[in-house]
Amino acid sequence: MNERNELLVCRRAKDPAKGTLDLPGGFIDMAETGEEGVTREVKEETGMEVEKAEYLFSLPNIYVYSGFTVHTLDQFFRCSVTDTLHYKAMDDAADVFFLPLKDIHTEDFGLGSIRKGLEIFLKEKEK
């Protein structure tokens, strides 16, 4: 999130759900904590440096890729970055931009677990 109450989102460059919206993220590497993984993934996909990663919640997920079904645990974090003005789409992201919370439509996000996570996040923001 930036100071204008906008959420950083990506457009997926690859399948599954190529071309749809997503949140920066990915799989955790072996021996990596959730905080380390989200910090690395945000840098790989946006070039942004995470200074703080605050764990919010997790959701069980089934992820199908290349014909394989993988059971995962999706972890959601609120991240603070050192600079919200300089970023670029890299790695798995075709585009990256800030989207005002009021303009977020969960159906624009291609992965069901991300849609569900956003619904939880947005409900909490309304409180």
What is the role of each PLM region?
Residues 1-22, 50, 81:
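N-terminal strand-loop-strand
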Residues 9, 76-78, 98:
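Conserved hydrophobic/aromatic beta-strand scaffold that supports enzyme active sites
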Residues 16, 62, 105:
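Flexible, glycine-rich phosphate/dinucleotide-binding loops
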Residues 23-56:
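The catalytic Nudix box helix
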Residues 28, 50, 59, 81, ...:
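Hydrophobic pocket-lining residues within nucleotide cofactor-binding pockets
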Residues 59-86, 125:
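Active-site-adjacent beta-strand/loop module that shapes the phosphate/pyrophosphate-binding cleft
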Residues 86-127:
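Nudix hydrolase/Nudix homology domain
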